[in-house]
Amino acid sequence: MKNTPHGYCICPEGGIKLKKETYDVTGMSCAACSSRVEKAVAKQPGAQQVAVNLLKNSMVVEYDESQLSSAQIIAAVEKAGYGASLHAKPGSAPAAQTAETGGASAAQKAYSDMKKRLALSLIFTIPLFYLSMGHMMGWPLPACFLGMENAMTFAFTQFLLLLPIVYINRQYYIVGFKTLWQRSPNMDSLIALGSSAAIVYGIYAIYKIGIGFGQMDMDTVHTYMMELYFESAGTILTLITMGKTMEARAKGKTSDAITKLMDLAPKTATVERNGVESVIPVEEVQLGDVLIVKAGESVPVDGVVLEGTSSVDESALTGESIPVEKQAGDSVIGATINKSGYFKMRATKVGDDTALSQIVRLVDEATSSKAPIAKLADKVSGVFVPVVITIAVIATAAWLLTGHSVEFALSIGISVLVISCPCALGLATPTAIMVGTGRGAVNGILIKSAEALETTHSVNTVVLDKTGTITQGKPVVTDVVDGGIGRDKLLSVAASLEKLSEHPLSEAIVAEAEKESLTFLSVDKFEQIPGQGIRGEVEGQLCLAGNRRMMEANRIENSELLAQGEALAEDGKTPLYFALDGKLIGLIAVADIVKPTSAQAIAELSNMGIEVVMLTGDNAKTAEAIRRQVGVDRVVAEVLPQDKEREIRRLQEGGKKVAMVGDGINDAPALARADVGIAIGAGTDVAIESADIVLMRSDLLDVSTAVQLSRAVIRNIKENLFWAFFYNAIGIPIAAGVFYPAFQLKMNPMLGALAMSFSSVFVVSNALRLRWFKAKHTAAAPKTVSSPSDSGVEIANSHTMASNNEKGETNMEKVISIEGMACMHCVNHVQQALSAVPGVKEAKVDLESKSATVSVDGSVTDAALKAAVDEAGYQAVSIR
């Protein structure tokens, strides 16, 4: 299902356009609540996907507008006993600000409200507890509360102290009994039932005391004076409120990472309009506005530098610790800090389109989604409360039937009700997901969904696209070997000629000459020679620049230089030879060099038990050279862009759990096919739809970090779920008195309430440990390949070629880049021409990539293939 702008998404089934909306839900207190809300909305006609987040009190619904409306969704939630409203999204405010006001402030408000409730509850609970328990502790009490003659004063005063506590915490009763009446009890129902049972029994005790006085039965007065239970009811309510206060405080910290990011967003911007500078709110910045950013200021929005130079700190968004130098033409990201310098910029993305806003949106969507690991907790939550109520009733009846007192049996029933904690089940997963995704965002790792976060931890194969992922993605000059005319002279002649070419290798040579401030010479009669190189007259002298084939075609020899070129080619570099007036004057090697951290990252992934595979369109020789440098386990060479998805599928069919890492340019099908698609080096383009995880930096170490983070989060979730299940599995039997006959082990209701409160606090606090997650990066040396015999390089589709080689002859597959094709007629002409060449087994021509893939035997030469294409009226640019 693909998201589209303005909250719509396309459902692949029939192309139905679904609307996606976020709702604020009120009244939820535990997993049973979120489960009921989810079921109530999911059964509405037209509802496609419903995800309720207990931690954020939010709900995301994808639905068919032709069958369902937002009003009907809200009505369904209200019918279930809860409140709902569309999540406020001010049109003028960017998503970051919306998330800030909607998420962080909501958590702060909840914490503030709970603090007030707790403070007011304590004002009455402390004297109530002192009065009821003081005489047993030997604490001094006023004379009016001492002795049986003051039993009625003693009891009624406790009742009066309890009433404010009940009123302050009335929400438990309102929600608890309402959901109980609707046959969907939740945690509030357990609290309401437990405390109400204690209150009713206490009122019954007051009546029994009164009757005892009327009948002068002091034994009855004494008995019921000790069985009031008002302090249990009041203390239960206060302890649970205390736990919820601590929980609310902890919940507020789960979004600290995103809150810190949003705090970076500047509130104002300096804009230049009609030559006049003025300071305006950042919300009023429009596309195309010219903005001024001074040293120490935050960049207001995303844009491009027009003039000036600067050093920009992007660490908060990308995790890049070293400030990045910026000059005219460079892009800048909103909310980054201008550490030094002064520059003018043009706004290219404003409001909800800025990188910061999209980061917040992605994290918000991830925390609103559900991980598959939470399904068991969801199933248990749906039946948990009714089962607990049933256990409490059975336990109370059982102890009464075995001859125990009403007081004993009632304390058992109340303990079962108040110790049970469905809340811990509901918080186990979302707290860890929220903290984990927030921590990832701080490190420049944007995880789009809880499912992606969970799947990443089980990945056992990582497939890396070579260009732009393992390597820099841009050719640079690595070696300059002159044949006697001097390095600068060779580079000057080469750059002068190459400047007229648009080939990426030419650009690398020109850039090297410019970096060294060399002189560019005049060039005449420039000409491109397809499949060989270029030629022209440099200051009157004929200059040739190209591959070895070009030198041989022009009978230019220099065995020493040619041998050096072959050695450089063995290292994965591309040697370009230069000749002046028929004499070889030198060679320049160009390569797409490996990023500094690629080998370290691949070593880390291997140490985690993950197989690393590299996909590349390069030939086997170049692929093997890269493999030796970085230590990948296996290489699949000569892969066309459109075949990457097929290679991923082949790995999956072999039982692998695959993560694909690519730069997102031509990797979309492969990213979508993989179990986890990781787009690397996305920069400001954080909305790559095909990827599950977006890495802001172009650094493979972040892939290792993402896997480590995923494993840490899933481990934390498992710890939380274990605690939630273990706590209830042990606590409920103890509270029910299962161990009382053998060990005299019995749970006091107040202790049960305390345990329940701290169970939820424990789960949230455990999740908060993820705030200190830090990836472990080791400087381990990469694995090395000492000889070709242990090579892990394979040719794409080699398994297909082998099956066609029935007679045992050696077949090869070659890829021809062709210019001049414009339609399917062209494709047919080229395919027929190539198929007619003797020795060609199969020819496939692709218009989109402007290439042909041919399967040939050893007798077919490149010249024959080139001639066939040229004779058909097209141009074979290269053959590999």
Regions found by a protein language model. Name each.
Residues 137-153, 181, 200, 439, ...:
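Membrane-embedded alpha-helical bundles of multi-pass transporters
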Residues 477, 481-608, 620, 632-648:
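P-type ATPase nucleotide-binding
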Residues 30, 37, 41, 61, ...:
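Residue-level signature of catalytic and energy-coupling elements of molecular machines
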Residues 160-172, 182, 196, 231-261, ...:
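Hydrophobic alpha-helical transmembrane segments
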Residues 46-54, 58-63, 67, 228-230, ...:
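Conserved cytosolic catalytic loops of P-type ATPases
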Residues 19, 35, 459, 538-540, ...:
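Conserved ATP-binding TGD loop and adjacent catalytic N/P-domain core of P-type ATPases
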Residues 72, 78-87, 91-98, 102, ...:
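Actuator/coupling domain of P-type ATPases
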Residues 1-153, 165, 251, 276-277, ...:
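Flexible metal-binding regulatory segments at protein termini and peripheral loops
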